[in-house]
Amino acid sequence: MGTDQLVRQAELLVGQVAHWTPARWRGRSDGVHALVQRLADAAAEAEGRTAYAVPRLADTVLPDQIRVMVADLVAAEHRPDVLDRLADDIRATRSAL
């Protein structure tokens, strides 16, 4: 599964939140930003570089940050078990929203 499942879960999450207004994000954005940070950390690990803090931009930018982090993970060809774990993480975040 790996890549396909990760991309699918990311698409579902982005589809769920991309249209949200700033008011709708209130109280929900911290969990999604934390997910973006975990995705960024995994991408850094896969690329063999130091992890960095993902900038905290406007909440409405979070869907784009998810897209970028998932694209980085796919390009880095991370291990399938890690991608499956991250797909589960995205699924759990979706459920929590």
Language model regions located:
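Short terminal alpha-helical segments
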Residues: 1-39, 87-90, 94
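Short, structured coil/loop segments at alpha-helix boundaries
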Residues: 3, 29, 47, 63, ...
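Extended aliphatic helical segments
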Residues: 7, 14-17, 32, 36, ...
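Amphipathic alpha-helical interaction modules
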Residues: 20-64
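Amphipathic alpha-helical binding modules
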Residues: 64-97
